[in-house]
Amino acid sequence: MEKKNHPSQVAFEDSFASSILSKNPPKKHRARLYMTGTGINGFTENEILFHCRLSSGRNYPNELERKLNIELERLDEPNPDGIGSHYRYRFKTAQDVQKVINLINHCAEQGKYQPVSKALTDNILSLYPTE
């Protein structure tokens, strides 16, 4: 005897739900958005891990430098325990940050997830010097 699924038992596969719910952004999107939002204070790899809930933040700054042909400022900071040090990365200008935001929006468009809004872009850019 063949069992038939009743409509209430079948998973709802309508595209309506997917059209109104935004797709979760990938790790790179979250990391890049965090990095741009830190302003002149900059960020460390550990801060990327903590704020974006990632397991590794090591290559995100270097990848941006290679992809966008920009150079991040690196400040060597001693660790709180006095053993070793780590880098604090900072974007130098608002133009560099605009390149990152353009990359974020380009990837968001391709991946069909939420891009950076104009208002948020303006807020982020106001955190950086223009030259």
List each language-model region with its residue ranges.
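DNA-binding patch around the recognition helix
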Residues: 2-25, 61-108
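Short amphipathic alpha-helical interface segments
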Residues: 28-40
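Short Gly/charged-rich anion-binding patches and loops
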Residues: 30, 59-60
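Short acidic, hydrophobic short linear motifs in intrinsically disordered regions
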Residues: 39-49
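Short, basic interhelical loop/turn and adjoining N-cap
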Residues: 52-59
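Amphipathic alpha-helical dimerization/coiled-coil segments
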Residues: 102-131
